[in-house]
UniProtKB/Swiss-Prot annotation:
Record field: catalytic activity: UDP-N-acetyl-alpha-D-muramate + NADP(+) = UDP-N-acetyl-3-O-(1-carboxyvinyl)-alpha-D-glucosamine + NADPH + H(+)
PROSITE patterns (UniProt xref): FAD_PCMH
Family statement: Belongs to the MurB family.
Main location: cytoplasm
UniProt name for this protein: UDP-N-acetylenolpyruvoylglucosamine reductase
Function, in words: Cell wall formation.
Active site, per annotation: 177, 227, 297
Pathway: Cell wall biogenesis; peptidoglycan biosynthesis
Domain FAD-binding PCMH-type: 34-198
One function term, GO molecular function aspect: UDP-N-acetylmuramate dehydrogenase activity
Biological process terms in GO annotation: cell division; cell wall organization; peptidoglycan biosynthetic process; regulation of cell shape
Any GO CC annotation of this UniProt entry: cytosol
Amino acid sequence: MNQYKNFIMQFEDIVGNNNVLIDEPMKKHTSFKVGGPADLLITPTTLEQVKDSIILCRNNSIPYYIIGNGSNLLVRDGGIRGVVIKFLKLGDIKVEGDRVIAQSGAPLTNICNEALKSNLGGLEFACGIPGSVGGAVTMNAGAYNGEISQVIESAKVIDKDGNVFLLNKEQLDLGYRMSAIQKYHYIVLEVTFKLHNSEYDTIKNRIMDLNRRRTEKQPLEYPSAGSTFKRPEGHFAAKLIEDTGLKGESIGGAQVSEKHSGFIINKGGATAGDILNLIEFVQNKVMEKFEVDLHTEVRIIGEENN
């Protein structure tokens, strides 16, 4: 039974009637296309609504989870007890000189395109990363020798008590797939990037080259959450998996991609359970062969199916 239905009217007062969904299947909101229902899913349209929603959750001991476009997220088949706050409608982007300021829900691709229009370079590496900027900053996303830490200036965040404040680059403490945001459970509201002036064609050609390489090497035609595992120190996850003989290995509808072993894909009809079982199988086999512990890069939330 959905124990949070009593709060529907209060959330509707904050975000509007059309922005509250009940027992919403999370497979509609993740790039893996799997996941059970969330008790409530709300989509705020202003940063003030985010703050008010978090305070309502805190004051009533309601668990809440923040998502962007769900591109680095695996929701278990039992779904989510509590409230999912989706930043889909918080995607404003503005350019001020050599700075690009974006709300947390803005897709990285949109930010890159705005930078391109203003002849600002530095974000080319991020143009093919499918996530939104809030998640990208939280995990210090990166690709092709670039990462968020190289271009970020500051981030406006909110804590669990509803306090809003600004963190500079040093305070964000960005490392490999980690940040102070993760450590202290902050939520990113807005991000400022400091870029550099460049030629339009130079930026455009770099973006096109990286996207071509992605298309050639990554299984973009299947649902996935991007790279499934973090890079272990001194190794590459994909090479360890391939050298263990697991390329193409499958459980149910989940498969280790034959195109890129670092990706676990939904080949068709997968459940979250299939994907989780395959992740565990890969981890165990790599540990047996190489004594290397693979840690997931994908964020895993939700309840097991009863």
